[in-house]
Amino acid sequence: MLLGLATISSGDVQLLDCPVPGGLPEALPKVGALVEGPAFYPYLSGRDNLIRFDSADRNADPTTRSARVDHALSRVGLTQAASKKVHAYSLGMKQRLGIANALLQPRELLVLDEPTNGLDPQGTREVRNLIRSLAAEGITIFISSHLLAEIEQICTHLAVMSQGKIVAQGSIAELSASETMRLTLETPDVEAAIEVLRENGITATSDGCVVSADLSSGQIKPEKIVKRLVQAKVAVRAFTVQAPTLEERFVLLTGEGFEVAR
């Protein structure tokens, strides 16, 4: 809908302060986009693909085409592979070429749909670093993704959608914040550890030698728990207190787990 590829059924949408769809002719030249799985001519080189795509852009200046293509390839780290046929590109290289296509013109906004989906670890790292470098240049980047671990590493702000509605939005720190932390303790003295926690108002469960419990901000401090465990002669092999992951927060916000909403 932002890019005018789908019709708005209700409500209002604005893109760079322009109403959609009426203001798209003014807004879209300032917007670059990468839709999941970008398509290229496999028998053409990366450079020739970009030249062909740029030729189809009525806003593109043909006199600067060659220089702009070379600059876009340089920005995404594909200068050395510019003459290679695209069928020989890795998935990560194809994603970077798709981003280069989105950067052929000066952009205020990049819309990236699943930019790391299906990539191996090396390809994921390449695209992640590229996105960070583009953001550092001052470009606003809007990412649609279900890979929450990647979102945590890349984004500064997040909106969570469930069944077509935004159920939460804010900075990553705000959405990851929680009044409840997860306490995990590894010990051979499981029963004694559970008893110490119970005496301090904490209900714990065990799985083998691992004891787990939820610890709210108003309860005893973690360092005092460790002190009392040691005083009770509980052998502590490991002790961690962690905030819920973004994935866990997502499940809490949307109610989506194995039983996905129908």
Per-segment meaning from a language model:
Residues 180-253:
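Short, charged/small-residue-rich alpha-helical element at the C-terminal edge
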Residues 1-143, 148-162, 168:
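ABC transporter nucleotide-binding domains
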Residues 166-171, 196-200:
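Short amphipathic beta-strand starts and helix->beta connectors
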